[in-house]
Amino acid sequence: MGFFDFMQESIAIDLGTANTLIIHNDKVVVDEPSIVAKNVRTGEVIAIGKRAQQMHGKAHKDIETMRPLKDGVIADFQSSEQMIRGFIKMIPRKRSLFSPALKMVVCIPSGVTEVEKRAVVDSAEHAGAKDVWLIME
């Protein structure tokens, strides 16, 4: 264990078309539907996961719900990035003066293209990951 290990946290993410799981400290800390609700006019993501699923099918002209992952890969980069970032914020974390660097292991389906792999890595990095490793299902 190194001196600066307290400044790093490791998480595992299973990005699924239906649900996303995040494991932190050997526990499932996030188990949410992979769905986002967006404001149609601004494109702003207003809800993710269970809150977005509750909005699905409701008649409101300014809100649409969508699944940013198709067949286990990223179909909408910005929405998936915001969804991942929101799910990471749901992780119970220790209070600290500094935010620890995140190391992520992301599970992706086998057979994805290099472009799709790059989209997952970019999305995780934009969501705050310092290091990203991909594991094929």
Over which residues does each language-model region extend?
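Nucleotide/phosphate-binding catalytic cleft detector across ATP-hydrolyzing
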Residues: 1-137
